């Protein structure tokens, strides 16, 4: 006859629940116990033909799809999208501007014609400030002086 210690209850079989628990642990959590980790590591191969599980592929795709950024980078990107980059206006960029070139050439030609035709009179040409602000804005100090006198 069998002794009570030798009886095997199918529900209390020490090997099968442990295997089921290990499989459930692999499926449910990403954190593995050291014993389970050793068993899983033994199953690994260097064969590239081994197919990866769909779960791991989906996790990898989700990780790759979401860019890593912190809060400050997100705020900076939102601000930059609201205000697009504009070029800085410098003296060189003004000199390269084709419309500004045409204006300068016309002004130079008019001045040369007046000088050649002896049309130059001292009071005919008003004072022009040569600073960059007046040059860029086409600001006429004589007009502003007249406004101040009123």
Swiss-Prot record:
Sample GO molecular function, one term: histone H3K9me2/3 reader activity
Subcellular location field: Nucleus; Cytoplasm
Effect of deleting the gene: Null mutation result in apparently normal offspring. No effect on early gonadal PGCs or gross abnormalities in the development of gametes. However, females display severely reduced fertility despite ovulation of normal numbers of oocytes. Null mutation resulted in preimplantation development failure. Embryos rarely reached the blastocyst stage.
Region (Disordered): 1-32
Xref: Pfam families: PGC7_Stella
Name of this protein: Developmental pluripotency-associated protein 3
Keyword Cytoplasm in record: yes
InterPro entries, per the entry: Dppa3
Organism for this UniProt entry: Mus musculus
Region (Required for H3K9me2-binding): 1-75
Role noted for this protein: Primordial germ cell (PGCs)-specific protein involved in epigenetic chromatin reprogramming in the zygote following fertilization. In zygotes, DNA demethylation occurs selectively in the paternal pronucleus before the first cell division, while the adjacent maternal pronucleus and certain paternally-imprinted loci are protected from this process.
Region (Required to exclude TET3 from the maternal pronucleus): 76-150
GO cellular component, one term: chromatin
Entry remark concerning the domains of this protein: Mediates binding to H3K9me2 via N-terminal region, while ability to exclude TET3 from the maternal pronucleus requires the C-terminal part.
Chief location: nucleus
Tissue expr: Expressed in the immature oocytes and in newborn ovaries. Subsequently detected in maturing oocytes and in preimplantation embryos. Expressed in pluripotent embryonic but not in differentiated somatic cells. Expressed in blastocysts, epiblasts, primordial germ cells, embryonic gonads and primitive spermatogonia. No expression is detected in adult testes.
Outcome of mutating residue 44 to A: Abolishes localization to the nucleus and ability to prevent DNA demethylation
GO biological process terms held by the UniProt record: embryonic cleavage; epigenetic programing of female pronucleus
Keywords: Chromatin regulator, Cytoplasm, Developmental protein, Nucleus
Basic and acidic residues bias spans: 1-22
């Amino acid at each position: 006859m069998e002794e009570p210690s030798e009886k095997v209850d199918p529900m209390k079989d020490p090997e099968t629940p442990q295997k089921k628990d290990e499989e459930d642990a692999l499926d449910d959590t990403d954190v593995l116990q050291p014993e389970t980790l050793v068993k899983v590591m033994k199953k690994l191969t260097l064969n590239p033909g081994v197919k990866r599980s769909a779960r791991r592929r989906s996790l990898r795709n989700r990780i790759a799809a979401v860019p890593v950024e912190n809060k400050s980078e997100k705020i900076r990107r939102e601000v930059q999208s609201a205000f697009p980059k504009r070029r800085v206006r410098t003296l060189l960029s003004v000199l390269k501007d084709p419309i500004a070139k045409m204006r300068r050439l016309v002004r130079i030609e008019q001045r040369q014609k007046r000088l050649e035709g002896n049309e130059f009179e001292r009071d005919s040409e008003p004072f022009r400030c040569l600073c960059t602000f007046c040059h860029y804005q086409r600001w006429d100090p004589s007009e502003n002086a007249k406004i101040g006198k009123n």
